Amino acid sequence: MAAAAPGPVELGFAEEAPAWRLRSEQFPSKVGGRPAWLGLAELPGPGALACARCGRPLAFLLQVYAPLPGRDDAFHRSLFLFCCREPLCCAGLRVFRNQLPRNNAFYSYEPPSETEALGTECVCLQLKSGAHLCRVCGCLAPMTCSRCKQAHYCSKEHQTLDWRLGHKQACTQSDKIDHMVPDHNFLFPEFEIVTETEDEILPEVVEMEDYSEVTGSMGGIPEEELDSMAKHESKEDHIFQKFKSKIALEPEQILRYGRGIKPIWISGENIPQEKDIPDCPCGAKRIFEFQVMPQLLNHLKADRLGRSIDWGVLAVFTCAESCSLGSGYTEEFVWKQDVTDTP
């Protein structure tokens, strides 16, 4: 996804794709599965990827590949969003930014091949940097199974989960450990995020369409009564209707990307003010970069005992200067707006 000055919005859609297209060397934008880390060193540690409320490891939700044209230090640039899988803790959200120059220690200077490479069918549990990844979630794994010394984990919780789901039997079979990674029912379903530019619709056209829809359904009501009804329309109704009108042409969109534009909100409640968005540690302001839409929830299959993680809008704000970080990851800011009981 190309990041530029405020302009047309890019819409993201979830589509199935072969696993090799979602690996790090392909610089993907994707939902679910394990993170396709960009920088392969100095990954966020377990402390940075733990829910602030319940302490459980966060699950990888999605990543967006968003290089900055004209910036040599951000020729490659990705944003990684994580969330807590526990429905009552869905506030546990963290987002990280990583960027690399074209000439770097991890990837070829030339664009990646468009064909599948050999050996890409196995789960990657160790990066080129030597860093080990958790067998359950694909995040940095400083813990090691004390018995086989070959299985690595981000936390005691994930080690226990893997032990219960098969590592207990595989632990003594050293030649099979890397090839026997069970389904831990922790990762979200994996999809590629494909993008297209949003069709430009003039605000006047949208307003006229909304007006026509309303007047068409209320054709017999006197003008004075319509004026009275309009005065009673709440700000909440107006914002929600604007949200619906904005997504009506592409109702399957799961993501809206536009660095420096304004997000669209689903509710008049809990809209952040400038003071609510913390500055980057470098001193620069943070600006809006993308938002995750509630339509993504349909793809996640996150229901558990009748409960599910939920949101209205997840809005991600990043450093306006996209400050240089070497090969490390820096945390950015995400704002969660819930769905209210809007008619």
UniProtKB/Swiss-Prot annotation:
Keywords: Apoptosis, DNA-binding, Metal-binding, Nucleus, Ubl conjugation, Zinc, Zinc-finger. GO terms for molecular function: DNA binding; zinc ion binding. Ubiquitinated by PRKN, promoting proteasomal degradation. Zn(2+) 2 binds at C145, C148, H167, C171. Its main location: nucleus. It comes from the Eukaryota. A zinc finger (MYND-type) spans 134-171. One of its GO terms (biological process) is apoptotic process. It holds the Pfam family PDCD2_C. SUPFAM superfamilies: HIT/MYND zinc finger-like (SSF144232). InterPro entries: PDCD2_C, Znf_MYND. It is found in: Nucleus. May be a DNA-binding protein with a regulatory function. May play an important role in cell death and/or in regulation of cell proliferation. This is Programmed cell death protein 2. The gene is Pdcd2.
